[in-house]
Each structure stands twice: as structure tokens, then as C-alpha cells.
């Protein structure tokens, strides 16, 4: 059974807090609660098993310790047709049979502290950059990025509420701290404008950020699709896990092979 949620119990919060996807769901609930049409959460139940889903715009996130309500979840996806599905591996055999979806592998990397180069300029890090400029940088690297109004509304809302933080370096490279829950930090939206690629800005910026977060006692990770894995390996970040996500193939984008923004 799938029912829309109006609240979250302490026990459910504790379960979601055990995984990165669960923490991501919690961050959206912290940002938006249960009253927005574009951010809806659902409880999956089957016998004594329970799972949770959150549909934010065109992304569906599923968190469950065991497979639960698989056929109902498949029907839910057929009705809503999210662009991306992030789910436990146990859901994939059922959901991968849906037409017009492709599997994309992504790797979790730990932001391992590394020395920055002598050329790095910490004073060039902006902690409250102009978000319009940030979007322009992101769009060059992620053609499947949300439309500007949707991205700006969500990003500015999450930043105002202290859930996320957007950073830039030399007005050329950007990275976002998507959430920080009990010193577990998810980093994403890493991009460098085309004119500055090959400059080493992203390498230094990420090393600086990894060092800063470690000094604050935080454990930080990011996800990378296969096309970007070699970069994170080259800069010394450690691969910790791999998983598969599903993305729609029937959406006309500039370059769907790059996948949507992480």
C-alpha cells in the first residue's frame, strides 16, 4: 500500500537517518515539510515491512530496508513518470522493466583531505555567490539541469533555511553542500565553466573544501556518474560505494548521456 504522509514518527526519522538516501529525504522534509505539491512524501507498507518515498519535482527517492510494495511502486512510477529514480538495489529488478528508462551507475566518493597547490587563493572563495552566475556555470556542465526558475527557487529556499550552502571559486568553479545532517555532508553540483576547464581550479577547490570539512569533524561524500569518475580518482578521493539510478530516455535534452545533475 502507498499512502501520502502527513507526518514522520521519531522511529521513522531514526531509520531514514541511517542511510545517505534517507538523509537526503530528511533534508527535503526539513526544507519543505508535507504541504507542498511539488514535494510529496509517501509511506510504503506491505505486511510488517515499511518504506518511504519522496517525489520532488521530477526526482523520486525511495528508501527501504527490504523490498516493499514493489508492484504498487511500479504503478506509481508509471503514473508520475519521474525523470530520475533513486532507489535501493532490491527495487531495480522490478523498476528496470519500465519502458524508456536507462540504468546509470554512480560512484560515491569520500572527500579525502589533500594538500592544495601554492596557486590556490582562499580569498577567492565566495560563500554567498550570485546564484544566477552559479546557474550559468552549472548549465554548461549539466545540460539536464532543472529550469532556472525551479533551480533558483529550490536552491535559494534551502540556503535561506540553512540546509544547503553554495560556494564558488574564482567565479569559475562551483560546489554545493546539499545538506549537513549530524556531521554527515552530501556535496553535489560540482562544475567549472568551459573557459576555466583545465585550470586546476576544481581540483584545488575540492581539496580545500575536503580539508575544511575534516577540520570541522565532518564526513563528506559526493556522487559521480561514470563519465566523471576518473576525475575524482585522479584528485585522490576514495571510492566508497557504487549504486544504480534510473533516468528517462524519452526526454529531449542537449546531451542525455551526461545524466541529470547530481
Residues covered by each model-derived region:
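Conserved GNAT acetyl-CoA-binding A-motif
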Residues: 79-89, 213-225
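Conserved acetyl-CoA-binding loop-helix of GNAT-fold acetyltransferases
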Residues: 68-76, 189-192, 198-215, 234
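A mid-sequence, solvent-exposed acidic-amphipathic segment
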Residues: 132-186, 191
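Conserved active-site tyrosine of GNAT-family acetyltransferases
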Residues: 95-98, 231-233, 237
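Terminal substrate-recognition subdomain of acyl/acetyltransferases
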Residues: 112-116, 227, 234-262
Amino acid at each position: 500500500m502507498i499512502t501520502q504522509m502527513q507526518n514522520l514518527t521519531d522511529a521513522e526519522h531514526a531509520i531514514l537517518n541511517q542511510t545517505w538516501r534517507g538523509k537526503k529525504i530528511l533534508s527535503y522534509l526539513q526544507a519543505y515539510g508535507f504541504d507542498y505539491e511539488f514535494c510529496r512524501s509517501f509511506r510504503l507498507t506491505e505486511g510488517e515491512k515499511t518504506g518511504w518515498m519522496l517525489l520532488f519535482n521530477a526526482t523520486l527517492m525511495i528508501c527501504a530496508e527490504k523490498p516493499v510494495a514493489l508492484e504498487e511502486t511500479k504503478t506509481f512510477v508509471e503514473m508520475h513518470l519521474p525523470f530520475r529514480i533513486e532507489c535501493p538495489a532490491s527495487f531495480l529488478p522490478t523498476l528496470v522493466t519500465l519502458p524508456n528508462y536507462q540504468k546509470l551507475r554512480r560512484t560515491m566518493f569520500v572527500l579525502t583531505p589533500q594538500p592544495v597547490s601554492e596557486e590556490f587563493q582562499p580569498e577567492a572563495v565566495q560563500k554567498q555567490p550570485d546564484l544566477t552566475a552559479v546557474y550559468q556555470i552549472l548549465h554548461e556542465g549539466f545540460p539536464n539541469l532543472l529550469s532556472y526558475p525551479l533551480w533558483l527557487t529550490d536552491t535559494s529556499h534551502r540556503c535561506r533555511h540553512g540546509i544547503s550552502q553554495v560556494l564558488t571559486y574564482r567565479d569559475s568553479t562551483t560546489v554545493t553542500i546539499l545538506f549537513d545532517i549530524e556531521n554527515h555532508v552530501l556535496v553535489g553540483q560540482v562544475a567549472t565553466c568551459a573557459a576555466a576547464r583545465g585550470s586546476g581550479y576544481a581540483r584545488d577547490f575540492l581539496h580545500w573544501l575536503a580539508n575544511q570539512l575534516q577540520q570541522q569533524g565532518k564526513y563528506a561524500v559526493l556522487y559521480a556518474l561514470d563519465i566523471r569518475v576518473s576525475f575524482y580518482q585522479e584528485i585522490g578521493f576514495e571510492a566508497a560505494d557504487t549504486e544504480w539510478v534510473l533516468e528517462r530516455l524519452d526526454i529531449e535534452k542537449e546531451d542525455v548521456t551526461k545524466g541529470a545533475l547530481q
